[in-house]
């Protein structure tokens, strides 16, 4: 088989960048999507210096036209896409916190719409746009970056570690993304495309903060593993470091 082609949104920093590094061992050519062109160029230079075969797509997930542009980019250059990592996303305010931005009863409607637009609607739109190319792959893989905070089962359990860690807009957007994972995996069950959700863990990133217990190298392992699943690997699941999580 020819070299795997991967696309990682938000790949210019944090978990996206680290996932690109992890895919080096899979022999993939990794194209990172970056809203900031200069940051993207610097990230590609670092990836190449580390031995990754890397490319850059100037990409803003919140712009509808960029989904079609991404399709055109991969179709014209490679005719297929093997790996899509839907990594780009935003939080709602500083987390953990107790402000109205975290409250189900008080979160401003414009903030709720903004978080859902980025973390859910834009992910769905991009995946739909690229799906014809993923179906052309002999082993298409879609990884949706979710969070343990998407788990309704754990949020409802007073004994769970996240029972008191609630940020409504962010959590609900990731729960919706998990629903997309389940439904799309079912639709693609008779194809060679696998779809899974990944919880990276609480990682030292711009979103996770310096107090997070996990390093980037560990946080990217779940995404990288799901992006390179064998043919008999799972689909329609929610995982952290190889272990299934409750929905």
Where are these regions (language model features)?
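Canonical Rossmann dinucleotide-binding motif of NAD(H)/NADP(H)-dependent dehydrogenases/reductases
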Residues: 2-31
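A glycine-rich helix->loop->beta "capping" turn
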Residues: 50-52, 73-86, 92, 108
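C-terminal helical subdomain
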Residues: 175, 190, 197-198, 205, ...
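Structural signature of the Rossmann-like NAD(P)-dependent dehydrogenase/reductase core
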Residues: 8-9, 86-87, 141-147, 194-199
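Hydrophobic positions on the long internal alpha-helix
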Residues: 85, 126-130, 134, 180-181
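Catalytic loop of short-chain dehydrogenase/reductase
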Residues: 90-116, 121, 135-189
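The beta1-alpha1 cofactor-binding region of Rossmann-like NAD(H)/NADP(H)-dependent oxidoreductases
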Residues: 37, 58-70
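Conserved glycine-rich Rossmann-like NAD(P)H-binding loop of the short-chain dehydrogenase/reductase
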Residues: 26-42
């Amino acid at each position: 088989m020819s070299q795997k082609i991967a696309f990682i949104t938000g790949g210019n920093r944090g978990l996206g960048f680290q996932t690109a590094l992890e895919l080096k061992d899979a022999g993939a050519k990794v194209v990172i999507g970056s809203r900031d062109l200069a940051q993207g160029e610097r990230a590609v230079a670092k990836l190449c210096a580390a031995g990754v075969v890397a490319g850059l797509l100037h990409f803003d997930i919140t712009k509808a036209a960029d989904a079609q542009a991404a399709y055109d980019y991969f179709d014209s250059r490679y005719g297929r896409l093997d790996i899509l990592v839907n990594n780009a996303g935003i939080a709602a305010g500083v987390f953990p916190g107790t402000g109205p931005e975290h409250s189900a009863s008080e979160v401003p409607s414009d903030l709720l719409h903004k978080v859902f637009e980025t973390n859910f609607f834009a992910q769905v739109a991009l995946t739909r746009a690229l799906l014809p190319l993923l179906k052309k792959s002999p082993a298409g893989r879609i990884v949706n970056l979710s969070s343990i905070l998407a788990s309704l089962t754990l949020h409802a359990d007073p004994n769970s570690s996240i029972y008191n860690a609630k940020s409504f807009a962010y959590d609900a957007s990731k729960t919706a993304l998990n629903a997309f994972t389940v439904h799309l995996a079912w639709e693609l069950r008779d194809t060679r495309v696998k779809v899974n959700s990944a919880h990276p863990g609480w990682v030292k990133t711009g979103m996770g903060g310096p107090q997070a217990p996990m390093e980037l190298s560990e946080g990217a392992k779940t995404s990288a593993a799901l992006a390179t699943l064998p043919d008999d690997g799972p689909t329609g699941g929610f995982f952290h470091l190889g272990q299934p999580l409750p929905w």
